[in-house]
Amino acid sequence: MAKEDLLTLEGVIDEILPDGRFGVMLENGHRIIAYTAGKMRKFRIRSIVGDSVRVEMTPYDLTKGRIVYREKVGGGGPGGVRRRR
């Protein structure tokens, strides 16, 4: 399957499921089960209920998807960015 065949949609996480999966309500009203992409896992990008996300789906199974981007929200909190020593 070529990468051009993927559908990219916007949605909001509405449920956290076991095994690193999430329930995502898409902007078109459909609800899917999505998992976190490998790069997001590698860099420990965490997602919580209410986060806006971008999901890639294959046209062959419109009930499952992969979360490839989490929209940034303002305010990192006090202290700024923490660096590893």
From Swiss-Prot:
InterPro entries reported for this sequence: NA-bd_OB-fold, RNA-binding_domain_S1_IF1, TIF_IF1
Domain S1-like: 1-72
Alphabetical keyword list: Cytoplasm, Initiation factor, Protein biosynthesis, RNA-binding, rRNA-binding
Main localization category: cytoplasm
Localization of this protein: Cytoplasm
Highest taxon in the source lineage: Bacteria
Gene Ontology CC terms, in alphabetical order: cytosol
MF GO annotations: ribosome binding; rRNA binding; translation initiation factor activity
PROSITE patterns hit by this protein: S1_IF1_TYPE (PS50832)
CDD domains according to UniProt: S1_IF1 (cd04451)
NCBIfam families: infA
HAMAP family named among the record's database cross-references: IF_1
Oligomer status and interactors: Component of the 30S ribosomal translation pre-initiation complex which assembles on the 30S ribosome in the order IF-2 and IF-3, IF-1 and N-formylmethionyl-tRNA(fMet); mRNA recruitment can occur at any time during PIC assembly.
Function comment: One of the essential components for the initiation of protein synthesis. Stabilizes the binding of IF-2 and IF-3 on the 30S subunit to which N-formylmethionyl-tRNA(fMet) subsequently binds. Helps modulate mRNA selection, yielding the 30S pre-initiation complex (PIC). Upon addition of the 50S ribosomal subunit IF-1, IF-2 and IF-3 are released leaving the mature 70S translation initiation complex.
Family per record: Belongs to the IF-1 family.
Name used for this protein in its record: Translation initiation factor IF-1 2
